[in-house]
Amino acid sequence: FLPILASLAATLGPKLLCLITKKC
């Protein structure tokens, strides 16, 4: 697992959840 992908998932994951659940 690439560190770059890990960092991307860590930064984009919460944002995607925020947009999907509309709980920002």
Curated annotation (Swiss-Prot):
Keyword S-adenosyl-L-methionine among record annotations: no
Annotated tissue distribution: Expressed by the skin glands.
Compartment(s) of residence: Secreted
Cysteine disulfide links: 18-24
Cell membrane as UniProt keyword: no
One biological process term in Gene Ontology: killing of cells of another organism
Pfam family, one: Antimicrobial_1
Residues in coiled coil: none
Signal peptide range in chain numbering: none
Keywords assigned by UniProt, alphabetized: Amphibian defense peptide, Antibiotic, Antimicrobial, Cytolysis, Disulfide bond, Fungicide, Hemolysis, Secreted
One of the record's GO cellular component terms: extracellular region
Family per similarity comment: Belongs to the frog skin active peptide (FSAP) family. Brevinin subfamily.
Function recorded in the entry: Antibacterial activity against Gram-positive bacterium S.aureus. Weak antifungal activity against C.albicans.
Protein name: Brevinin-1BYc
Organism: Rana boylii
